[in-house]
Amino acid sequence: MEKTSLKLVFLFSLTVIALCLSLSAAREMAKEEVNCIGGHCPDGKKDCNCLPLIAPTMDIYETNESCRTDNECIKYCPKGCKIVDCNFGTCLCEYC
């Protein structure tokens, strides 16, 4: 009986220690998540790892212009598009 109760106390102690360690690790992760607000360090914070905000790029631009060949779409797509296609009668401009 005494060996069983010692094993239970030991097991309970290990469980409590593991729980405390996991809670402290979760608290540290929560602190790191709020370092950057809007891509900048909040006031009072010195060591932030804020990455610059990147503007989204438009990969595909679909016009409402009808077409029969790819060459017809060149005049409707913005300059600098790498791929200009006539796709099922609609001009598609890609990688602009």
From Swiss-Prot:
Keywords: Antimicrobial, Disulfide bond, Fungicide, Plant defense, Secreted, Signal. Disulfide bonds join 48-96, 67-86, 73-91, 77-93. One of its GO terms (biological process) is defense response to fungus. GO terms for cellular component: extracellular region. It comes from the Eukaryota. It is found in: Secreted. Its main location: secreted. Residues 1-26 form the signal peptide. Belongs to the DEFL family. This is Putative defensin-like protein 263.
